[in-house]
C-alpha cells in the first residue's frame, strides 16, 4: 500500500483552470485551507497535468465543490486528459465573479483564487491561492455550516467515492 493512502478518504474537488478554448477541469483530492484571515487555500498538482500548465500561465484557478450528482463528471475529470474532456462532461461552465477562469454551475460551491505562491514538493507543485471570491448553493451550507444532505463527495480509492452520513456525532 502507498503511504499517502493512509490519509484517505479525502474530500474531492474539481479544479478549473484556463479560460476560453483552454479551459480545463481536473479532479483533485489534495486541497486544503492555508489561512482563514485572509482566506487562502492550496492545491497540489502534478507538473505533467494540463491544469498545472494553465495555472502557471494564467495565475488563477477555481476550486469547485462537487456533489454525488456530478460523480460521472468527477470521474471524467480525473481520468481523461486535456480540455477536450469537457465535451464528455455534462457540467455547465459559467462566468466567475472575480477571475477569468469559469466556475461550474452544478457545484455546491465555487472558490475563486489568484495564485500568490507556488512551490515544488516531490512530484507535485503546491499552488497557494488567495480567495478573491466565492459562490455557493444556499441549501448546501445552511446556518453557516455544510448540510450533509447535499452529498459532498469524498474519494476512497481509484473509482470508489462516498458521501458523508447525515448523522452528526458531537464530541462532548
Swiss-Prot record:
Cofactor(s) it depends on: FMN
Transmembrane segments: none
Disulfide bonds: none
Keywords: Flavoprotein, FMN
GO MF annotation list: FMN binding
Keyword hit for Flavoprotein: yes
Coiled coil: none
Family assignment from sequence similarity: Belongs to the flavoredoxin family.
Protein name: Uncharacterized protein PH0856
Lineage: Archaea, Methanobacteriati, Methanobacteriota, Thermococci, Thermococcales
Amino acid at each position: 500500500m502507498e503511504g499517502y493512502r493512509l490519509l484517505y478518504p479525502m474530500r474531492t474537488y474539481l479544479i478549473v483552470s484556463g479560460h476560453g478554448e483552454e479551459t480545463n477541469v481536473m479532479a483533485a483530492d489534495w486541497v486544503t485551507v492555508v489561512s482563514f484571515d485572509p482566506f487562502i487555500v492550496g492545491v497540489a498538482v502534478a507538473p505533467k497535468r494540463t491544469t498545472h500548465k494553465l495555472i502557471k500561465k494564467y495565475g488563477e484557478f477555481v476550486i469547485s465543490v462537487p456533489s454525488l450528482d456530478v460523480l460521472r463528471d468527477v470521474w471524467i475529470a480525473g481520468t481523461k486528459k486535456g480540455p477536450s474532456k469537457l465535451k464528455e462532461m455534462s457540467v455547465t461552465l459559467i462566468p466567475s465573479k472575480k477571475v477569468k477562469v469559469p466556475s461550474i454551475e452544478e457545484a455546491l460551491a465555487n472558490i475563486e483564487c489568484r495564485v500568490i505562491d507556488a512551490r515544488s514538493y516531490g512530484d507535485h507543485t503546491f499552488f497557494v491561492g488567495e480567495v478573491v471570491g466565492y459562490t455557493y448553493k444556499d441549501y448546501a451550507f445552511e446556518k453557516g455550516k455544510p448540510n450533509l444532505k447535499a452529498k459532498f463527495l469524498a474519494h476512497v480509492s481509484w473509482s470508489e467515492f462516498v458521501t458523508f452520513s447525515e448523522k452528526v456525532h458531537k464530541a462532548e
